[in-house]
Amino acid sequence: MRPVNGCPVYAQGQPDAVNAYIQKKKVIVDTSKAELCFADDRQCHPVLIGVATPKGTFGLTLNSTDKPGYGGEVIGFKQEGDFLFALHRVWNQIPSERRNERIASPSVSDRIMTNGCINVSDAVYEKLRHYFVLEVI
């Protein structure tokens, strides 16, 4: 996977107004609820996560991919060796995993099942393309 823009848009040392805007364009994933919330409008949505989903604060980078099931791109947030932890649309390449059913489940335990990436609905993904910071708690 390669960055579309060439580099992450979140950077240290920016003027205060820029930092304030970047912080407004932040999303928070609460792993205890398997839920993603947008900091600016406080809307929250269920997500699929995994026990390996890393916690912390990360810059978001749009990455193109030709791997099947990702719709051509993912939003990367942490690289570990050859593995990119990313936010992406619900990955449905293994039907028996029932990911669409699981993301709609009210049970948090149903939504903890990925290898560490964060799966979101198509509508949430499109909104995420305009955000800069991810905080996983």
Q: For each predicted feature, which ranges?
A:
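Intrinsically disordered, low-complexity
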Residues: 1-55, 136-137
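Exported/periplasmic cell-wall-interacting domains
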Residues: 64-137
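Compositionally biased, intrinsically disordered low-complexity regions
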Residues: 8, 15, 52, 58-61, ...
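Short, isolated positions in well-ordered beta-strands
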Residues: 43-44, 59, 85
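Short, surface-exposed linear segments at secondary-structure transitions and domain or protein termini
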Residues: 50-60, 94-99
